[in-house]
Curated annotation (Swiss-Prot):
The lineage of its organism: Eukaryota, Metazoa, Chordata, Craniata, Vertebrata. This is Cornifelin. Part of the insoluble cornified cell envelope (CE) of stratified squamous epithelia. The gene is Cnfn. Belongs to the cornifelin family. It comes from Mus musculus (Mouse). Keywords: Cytoplasm, Keratinization.
Length: 111
């Protein structure tokens, strides 16, 4: 015997919300880690290459146009850090050494 279908299956809307966090250290907390601070001040491209390598990307990525911006945005996305592409752009454009030091410290803390 067959039974008629009286209701359609419903689609379950599962929504996952991830809790966004802040950077563990501030943009101007450069002196919290003196070796990183000195490297970011006097050899920022070397620090950028190290950050890229530690993050699992090609060490040449910082030399590509927009490479540092995508690296910082990728770091925010991977670690669920609050912010926006605009904030990333402003930090890297107006305060490159501080932004690089912040990224290096974040990787040290997270890894």
């Amino acid at each position: 015997m067959s039974y008629p279908v009286t209701s359609q299956p419903q689609c379950a809307n599962t929504c996952y919300q991830t809790q966004l966090s802040d950077w563990h250290t501030g943009l101007t907390d450069c002196c919290n880690d003196m070796p990183v601070c000195l490297c970011g001040t006097f050899a920022p491209l070397c620090l950028a290459c190290r950050i890229s390598d530690d993050f699992g990307e090609c060490c040449c990525a910082p030399y590509l146009p927009g490479g540092l911006h995508s690296l910082r945005t990728g770091m925010r996305e991977r670690y669920h850090i609050q912010g926006s592409v605009g904030h990333d752009w402003a930090a890297l454009t107006f305060c490159l050494p501080c932004a690089l030091c912040q990224m290096a410290r974040e990787l040290k803390i997270r890894e």
